[in-house]
Protein backbone atom coordinates (compact mmCIF):
# COMPACT_ATOMS: atom_id res chain seq x y z
CA UNK A 1 0.00 0.00 0.00
CA UNK A 2 1.41 3.38 -0.99
CA UNK A 3 1.74 5.96 1.79
CA UNK A 4 -0.38 9.05 2.23
CA UNK A 5 1.34 12.40 2.80
CA UNK A 6 -0.53 14.69 5.21
CA UNK A 7 0.47 18.31 5.70
CA UNK A 8 -0.67 19.57 9.11
CA UNK A 9 -0.81 23.34 8.84
CA UNK A 10 1.13 25.47 11.27
CA UNK A 11 -2.00 27.57 11.79
CA UNK A 12 -3.43 24.70 13.85
CA UNK A 13 -0.69 25.13 16.47
CA UNK A 14 -2.10 25.98 19.88
CA UNK A 15 -5.65 25.15 18.80
CA UNK A 16 -7.83 22.20 19.75
CA UNK A 17 -7.93 21.22 16.06
CA UNK A 18 -4.27 20.22 16.23
CA UNK A 19 -4.91 17.69 18.99
CA UNK A 20 -8.03 16.38 17.25
CA UNK A 21 -6.27 15.94 13.91
CA UNK A 22 -3.40 14.12 15.59
CA UNK A 23 -5.89 11.79 17.27
CA UNK A 24 -7.35 11.03 13.84
CA UNK A 25 -4.02 10.55 12.08
CA UNK A 26 -2.42 8.24 14.64
CA UNK A 27 -5.32 5.80 14.25
CA UNK A 28 -4.99 5.65 10.46
CA UNK A 29 -5.33 2.23 8.91
CA UNK A 30 -2.84 3.11 6.18
CA UNK A 31 0.81 4.23 6.19
CA UNK A 32 1.21 7.99 6.25
CA UNK A 33 3.75 10.75 6.80
CA UNK A 34 2.89 13.99 8.59
CA UNK A 35 4.48 17.11 7.09
CA UNK A 36 4.51 20.02 9.56
CA UNK A 37 3.76 23.56 8.53
CA UNK A 38 6.01 26.38 9.61
CA UNK A 39 3.47 28.16 11.80
CA UNK A 40 4.69 30.74 14.28
CA UNK A 41 8.28 29.61 13.73
CA UNK A 42 8.16 30.56 10.04
CA UNK A 43 6.37 33.82 10.87
CA UNK A 44 9.33 34.77 13.05
CA UNK A 45 11.57 34.29 10.02
CA UNK A 46 9.41 36.77 8.08
CA UNK A 47 9.53 39.27 10.94
CA UNK A 48 13.29 38.91 11.34
CA UNK A 49 13.86 39.32 7.59
CA UNK A 50 12.19 42.74 7.68
CA UNK A 51 14.52 43.96 10.42
CA UNK A 52 17.74 42.11 9.56
CA UNK A 53 17.38 42.33 5.75
CA UNK A 54 18.74 38.87 4.96
CA UNK A 55 18.06 37.37 1.54
CA UNK A 56 15.13 35.23 0.44
CA UNK A 57 17.70 32.48 -0.11
CA UNK A 58 18.63 32.57 3.58
CA UNK A 59 14.97 32.91 4.56
CA UNK A 60 14.17 29.75 2.58
CA UNK A 61 16.60 27.71 4.67
CA UNK A 62 15.31 29.26 7.89
CA UNK A 63 11.68 28.56 6.96
CA UNK A 64 12.50 24.89 6.36
CA UNK A 65 14.21 24.78 9.74
CA UNK A 66 11.02 26.33 11.17
CA UNK A 67 9.14 23.30 9.85
CA UNK A 68 11.64 21.10 11.72
CA UNK A 69 10.81 22.98 14.92
CA UNK A 70 7.06 22.57 14.53
CA UNK A 71 7.60 18.92 13.59
CA UNK A 72 9.51 18.30 16.81
CA UNK A 73 6.62 19.86 18.73
CA UNK A 74 4.08 17.67 16.91
CA UNK A 75 6.07 14.49 17.48
CA UNK A 76 5.84 14.99 21.24
CA UNK A 77 2.05 15.02 21.20
CA UNK A 78 1.46 11.26 20.93
CA UNK A 79 3.55 8.14 21.64
CA UNK A 80 2.79 6.74 18.18
CA UNK A 81 4.44 9.72 16.48
CA UNK A 82 8.11 9.51 15.51
CA UNK A 83 10.52 12.16 14.20
CA UNK A 84 11.85 11.29 10.74
CA UNK A 85 14.39 13.11 8.61
CA UNK A 86 15.00 10.55 5.85
CA UNK A 87 13.08 7.97 3.82
CA UNK A 88 14.63 5.12 5.78
CA UNK A 89 13.29 6.76 8.95
CA UNK A 90 9.80 6.56 7.43
CA UNK A 91 10.21 2.86 6.70
CA UNK A 92 11.52 2.19 10.19
CA UNK A 93 8.56 4.03 11.74
CA UNK A 94 6.02 2.14 9.62
CA UNK A 95 7.58 -1.21 10.52
CA UNK A 96 7.26 -0.26 14.19
CA UNK A 97 3.61 0.71 13.78
CA UNK A 98 4.36 4.42 14.18
CA UNK A 99 3.50 7.55 12.21
CA UNK A 100 6.58 9.47 11.03
CA UNK A 101 6.65 13.26 11.34
CA UNK A 102 8.92 14.63 8.63
CA UNK A 103 11.69 17.02 9.67
CA UNK A 104 12.48 18.30 6.17
CA UNK A 105 15.78 20.14 6.54
CA UNK A 106 18.12 17.23 5.80
CA UNK A 107 16.27 16.28 2.59
CA UNK A 108 14.92 19.58 1.31
CA UNK A 109 17.40 22.37 2.02
CA UNK A 110 19.87 21.32 -0.66
CA UNK A 111 17.37 19.98 -3.19
CA UNK A 112 17.94 21.64 -6.56
CA UNK A 113 14.37 21.05 -7.74
CA UNK A 114 12.86 23.14 -4.91
CA UNK A 115 12.76 26.89 -5.73
CA UNK A 116 14.29 29.00 -2.98
CA UNK A 117 11.48 31.50 -2.54
CA UNK A 118 8.65 32.49 -0.20
CA UNK A 119 6.36 31.18 -2.95
CA UNK A 120 7.32 27.73 -1.68
CA UNK A 121 5.71 26.78 1.62
CA UNK A 122 5.05 23.50 3.38
CA UNK A 123 2.23 22.88 0.85
CA UNK A 124 4.75 22.60 -1.98
CA UNK A 125 7.27 20.72 0.14
CA UNK A 126 4.60 18.15 0.96
CA UNK A 127 3.92 17.75 -2.77
CA UNK A 128 7.66 17.37 -3.38
CA UNK A 129 7.82 14.66 -0.70
CA UNK A 130 5.05 12.74 -2.46
CA UNK A 131 7.33 12.42 -5.48
CA UNK A 132 10.27 11.28 -3.36
CA UNK A 133 8.40 8.42 -1.67
CA UNK A 134 5.93 7.47 -4.40
CA UNK A 135 2.83 8.66 -2.56
CA UNK A 136 -0.25 8.88 -4.77
CA UNK A 137 -2.29 11.14 -2.50
CA UNK A 138 -1.62 14.37 -0.65
CA UNK A 139 -3.89 15.73 2.08
CA UNK A 140 -3.50 19.37 3.11
CA UNK A 141 -5.10 20.16 6.47
CA UNK A 142 -6.19 23.78 6.70
CA UNK A 143 -7.97 25.91 9.29
CA UNK A 144 -10.55 26.98 6.72
CA UNK A 145 -12.86 25.04 4.44
CA UNK A 146 -12.01 25.77 0.79
CA UNK A 147 -14.74 27.56 -1.15
CA UNK A 148 -13.57 26.07 -4.43
CA UNK A 149 -12.40 22.68 -5.68
CA UNK A 150 -10.26 24.20 -8.43
CA UNK A 151 -6.54 24.40 -7.69
CA UNK A 152 -6.00 27.57 -9.70
CA UNK A 153 -8.71 29.38 -7.75
CA UNK A 154 -7.26 28.17 -4.47
CA UNK A 155 -3.88 29.63 -5.45
CA UNK A 156 -5.51 32.95 -6.31
CA UNK A 157 -7.36 32.95 -2.99
CA UNK A 158 -4.19 32.28 -1.00
CA UNK A 159 -5.46 28.96 0.35
CA UNK A 160 -2.41 27.14 -1.08
CA UNK A 161 0.96 28.50 -2.10
CA UNK A 162 1.73 29.76 -5.62
CA UNK A 163 4.19 26.97 -6.42
CA UNK A 164 1.94 24.06 -5.52
CA UNK A 165 0.58 23.51 -9.07
CA UNK A 166 4.14 23.24 -10.36
CA UNK A 167 5.41 21.04 -7.52
CA UNK A 168 2.43 18.68 -7.53
CA UNK A 169 3.23 15.51 -9.45
CA UNK A 170 1.09 14.69 -12.47
CA UNK A 171 -0.30 11.58 -10.81
CA UNK A 172 -0.64 12.96 -7.29
CA UNK A 173 -4.25 13.29 -6.14
CA UNK A 174 -4.79 16.35 -3.94
CA UNK A 175 -7.28 16.62 -1.07
CA UNK A 176 -7.89 19.52 1.31
CA UNK A 177 -9.59 19.14 4.68
CA UNK A 178 -10.83 21.93 6.92
CA UNK A 179 -12.89 22.22 10.10
CA UNK A 180 -16.07 20.74 8.60
CA UNK A 181 -14.22 17.56 7.59
CA UNK A 182 -12.74 17.29 11.08
CA UNK A 183 -16.18 17.54 12.65
CA UNK A 184 -17.33 14.63 10.49
CA UNK A 185 -14.38 12.51 11.62
CA UNK A 186 -14.87 12.93 15.35
CA UNK A 187 -15.33 9.58 17.02
CA UNK A 188 -14.87 7.66 13.77
CA UNK A 189 -11.72 5.61 14.22
CA UNK A 190 -9.68 4.28 12.60
CA UNK A 191 -9.23 6.52 9.57
CA UNK A 192 -9.24 4.11 6.63
CA UNK A 193 -9.48 6.48 3.66
CA UNK A 194 -8.42 9.98 2.66
CA UNK A 195 -10.74 12.65 4.07
CA UNK A 196 -11.30 16.06 2.54
CA UNK A 197 -12.33 17.60 -0.75
CA UNK A 198 -10.76 16.28 -3.94
CA UNK A 199 -9.17 19.28 -5.66
CA UNK A 200 -9.27 19.48 -9.45
CA UNK A 201 -6.47 20.81 -11.66
CA UNK A 202 -8.48 23.00 -13.99
CA UNK A 203 -7.80 26.58 -15.05
CA UNK A 204 -4.10 26.41 -14.29
CA UNK A 205 -2.78 28.24 -17.35
CA UNK A 206 -0.74 31.17 -16.16
CA UNK A 207 -0.65 29.83 -12.61
CA UNK A 208 1.65 26.82 -12.74
CA UNK A 209 4.20 28.24 -15.20
CA UNK A 210 6.00 30.38 -12.65
Name the predicted role of every residue range.
Residues 1-210:
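C-terminal catalytic "cap/lid" subdomain
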Amino acid sequence: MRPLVVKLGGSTAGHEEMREWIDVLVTAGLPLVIVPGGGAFAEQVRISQRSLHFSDDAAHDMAILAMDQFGIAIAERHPRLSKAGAIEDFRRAWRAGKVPVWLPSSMARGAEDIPRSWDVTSDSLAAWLCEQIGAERLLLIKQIDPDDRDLGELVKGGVVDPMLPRMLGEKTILHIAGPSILRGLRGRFPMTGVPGQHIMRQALEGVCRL
